[in-house]
Amino acid sequence: MVAENNKNKDVTLSASMDNNNNNIKGTNIHLEVHQKEPALVKPESETRKGLYFLSNLDQNIAVIVRTIYCFKSEERGNEEAVQVIKKALSQVLVHYYPLAGRLTISPEGKLTVDCTEEGVVFVEAEANCKMDEIGDITKPDPETLGKLVYDVVDAKNILEIPPVTAQVTKFKCGGFVLGLCMNHCMFDGIGAMEFVNSWGQVARGLPLTTPPFSDRTILNARNPPKIENLHQEFEEIEDKSNINSLYTKEPTLYRSFCFDPEKIKKLKLQATENSESLLGNSCTSFEALSAFVWRARTKSLKMLSDQKTKLLFAVDGRAKFEPQLPKGYFGNGIVLTNSICEAGELIEKPLSFAVGLVREAIKMVTDGYMRSAIDYFEVTRARPSLSSTLLITTWSRLGFHTTDFGWGEPILSGPVALPEKEVTLFLSHGEQRRSINVLLGLPATAMDVFQEQFLQI
């Protein structure tokens, strides 16, 4: 069922972009996107009402994530794209009914979802150019790519932003882009991937490969809560190096660095040198990349030697919980782990030292650690601090590239922007997706230093 929202008028958004596409290098395209009036797409049939519980792992990460998926088929134009995707959304919302609700605050003062069946905000749009004229979407570009995602511009806080908004933008070449704006409290990367892939399966008339498991109370805090770990992920670190002022004084540049299989091999070799514990042992691509980016970013920001620096990254806890989370668990099944050391030690010691810190942070994540993190939030209501921190999030193992609404898999997909300046994203890339793109934002002078270190690998 689709209900029209008459509060909004048609809108035209525009942005100039320097196009780095190899076919039209050097051209300057002025992208205009005409958005039609938003509609509300409701579940096709009646769904459960009332308040829907969000776990403490969901509470910790209520940030907006914007992504785009570019589709183009030689056999099928974009004439039916809006109709097919909108209808399939209405059908898949029967399974993912909380997405049609609205965020609110529970009597306990926590985020929860009021399952009102109000619907997902859906926008049809048209662009004034061909899809390959968008340029390089392998790096975040909120000014340009943001035109392909619908934002609730007058929202004062996340409670006024629907859990999901969708925009389908048709291009003159017959291709189209699906832009999604989703609140991370509704699902992590795996949950989001399963939702979008299920949406595509419904569009093609197929049954869901992985029906969602919706009961998040299985991750309820213990009664009484038991905090059994230090949980330095919540620690506020003093900014002795005035890093925040550097971001204020200089423009932030967003760049994508491609680590192909050969570069990853070299990095992993460097990562096991000068270490008795790692000598002769291989390390994973994630361990080597995370260690390199942490050291290189710390050096690029010219942190003082005695400045503490924190590495945060998410570990999928689905198989680590006891018992394991059910297949299709719809909420956040990730937990943040961490490592803290002084910048001087991190930079002066070999890469293998940082790899060891990453490895120890991974080993920390057990059922007990994750339950303790859930209980920590229950007692303190604290959220992880990003002060003097690098937060790495990994999409390289997620199957967003397999999404198919009937036009084949996306030719490109990726984030519109990084949610915070401290966030770095790992994305799979290239032939057989064996390369990894590292996306990050740094002040201009720091980005130059980071690039020099990348070229030295």
Swiss-Prot record:
UniProt keyword Cell wall biogenesis/degradation present: yes
Molecular function per GO: hydroxycinnamoyltransferase activity; omega-hydroxypalmitate O-sinapoyl transferase activity
KO phenotype (gene knockout): Elimination of suberin-associated ester-linked ferulate. Altered permeability and sensitivity of seeds and roots to salt stress.
Domain of life: Eukaryota
InterPro entries attached to this UniProt entry: CAT-like_dom_sf, Plant_Fungal_Acyltransferase
Activity versus pH, per record: Optimum pH is 7.5.
Active site: 184 (proton acceptor), 404 (proton acceptor)
UniProt KW keywords: Acyltransferase, Cell wall biogenesis/degradation, Transferase
Tissue: Expressed in roots, seedlings, leaves, stems, flowers and siliques. Detected at the protein level in roots and in seed coats.
EC nos: 2.3.1.188
Gene Ontology biological process terms in this record: cell wall pectin biosynthetic process; suberin biosynthetic process
Temperature effects on activity: Optimum temperature is 10 degrees Celsius.
Catalytic reaction list: 16-hydroxyhexadecanoate + (E)-feruloyl-CoA = 16-feruloyloxyhexadecanoate + CoA
Pfam family, one: Transferase
Role, per record: Involved in the synthesis of aromatics of the suberin polymer. Specifically affects the accumulation of the ferulate constituent of suberin in roots and seeds, but has no effect on the content of p-coumarate or sinapate.
Family: Belongs to the plant acyltransferase family.
PANTHER family attached to this UniProt entry: OMEGA-HYDROXYPALMITATE O-FERULOYL TRANSFERASE, TRICHOTHECENE 3-O-ACETYLTRANSFERASE
Protein name: Omega-hydroxypalmitate O-feruloyl transferase
